[in-house]
UniProtKB/Swiss-Prot annotation:
The lineage of its organism: Eukaryota, Viridiplantae, Streptophyta, Embryophyta, Tracheophyta. This is Chlorophyll a-b binding protein 1A, chloroplastic. The N-terminus of the protein extends into the stroma where it is involved with adhesion of granal membranes and post-translational modifications; both are believed to mediate the distribution of excitation energy between photosystems I and II. Chlorophyll b 5 binds at residues 164, 261. Coiled coil: none annotated. Signal peptide: none annotated. Residues 1-34 form a transit peptide.
Amino acid sequence: MAAAAMALSSPSFAGQAVKLSPSASENSGNGRITMRKAVAKSAPSSSPWXXXXXXXXXXXXXXXXXXXXXXXXXXXXXXXXXXXXXXXXXXXXXXXXXXXXXXXXXXXXXXXXXXXXXXXXXXXXXXXXXXXXXXXXXXXXXXXXXXXXSLVHAQSILAIWACQVVLMGAVEGYRIAGGPLGEVVDPLYPGGSFDPLGLAEDPEAFAELKVKEIKNGRLAMFSMFGFFVQAIVTGKGPLENLADHLADPVNNNAWAFATNFVPGK
């Protein structure tokens, strides 16, 4: 019985010796251990519109995309009707202008909506809506933004304009030519002190944010244009028009104003 138990527990029970553990000489080979820092990579977007191989919306219209076309700036025959992206140099300049103007329009649309939202939330702001601001700004002592003369109260719109020119000129000069904020690597996306939130550190997320910035900027430019047209026609800001439309969608819409203009009246 004891012999049977020994035979069962022996590694050479099946007639072939089983190697239980590697020998010391095998352990001490000349292997090398490398350690690397595991950085959590942000997962690329699952959205079909902002990834690198984005679906082109005009895919049915033009089968062949031009060589200069990326996902963000489709330069197919249908997408660039004015042939603005025909030359590569002009396309690069137009892309730079699109990104810069898109960032400005995104801020402007946010400000136009925010002022109307503040007025709707019963905050007593003396400044008018975005539509009527130009008329009020030229009048003397009208640029009291928070309706309290002690906070921000500019007597002259020209003084505000001069300060804006100086400040924006300095920032743009640093962005193009470098300066105390650091050297310029890419003037369109400067990074460094211009990127205080560190949004551009991960290259994949940065590439996706570039596409989102251009797409949302185009929407913001178009919606800002729509805000101006609405204000010219109705004399109200965007949020007031939206509230009127939601209150009575049948009567308060663009068609009611479009049929309102009778020549000679």
